[in-house]
Amino acid sequence: MELIDKIQKNDEVMEEFHTSIHHGIYVSNAAYLLAKEIRLPEEQCYELAVAGMLHDIGKIRASKLLYIEQPDHHFVIRQLNYLRKHPFLGFDLLKDQGYSDFVLESILFHHENYDGSGFPSNLFGELIPIGARILRICDVFVTLITKKAYRPAYDVDTALEFMIGEVKNFDMKLFLAFMNLVEKLDVDRDIKKKTPVL
């Protein structure tokens, strides 16, 4: 209860909490739309929407580190190391809850980069499950177009330019499909809506 009280009394933390919820919804919407764009089976499109909603659920286990300030100067390093584990923590949290392997693998590997530089397993190329490759693109895009405490939201063109500069992280075919998709969408209406496609 002490943790919950501290969170509720901290306006900045509460704003971040709401931002996290919206982030999950936006990633869910984007992942579903990209899956439809590349003509994945409807069941996988739906499962990607589920995975998008839950992809950062492992951060819940990091909440004590995230939301309670500590005087320890090693705190930031510990926090970052713990956050790098959040894909596995999310997988572990959900593995016995009836989710499909497709959903679980998409969540577990959503921070893998196409060139092998990601985490938690340094997978590369098509060894990364397609759901995770889709989430990687959508997660980065949504992060860029969302306002943060330390910067304003980027417009769509700036976000895509940034992603082009980091294109080694993404499956090129999927990224080109995503760029084509974004050109056809109203991002505020189709991705940044507050209700998920589920």
Give the predicted meaning of each segment.
Residues 3-198:
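Metal-dependent catalytic cores of enzymes that make or break cyclic nucleotides
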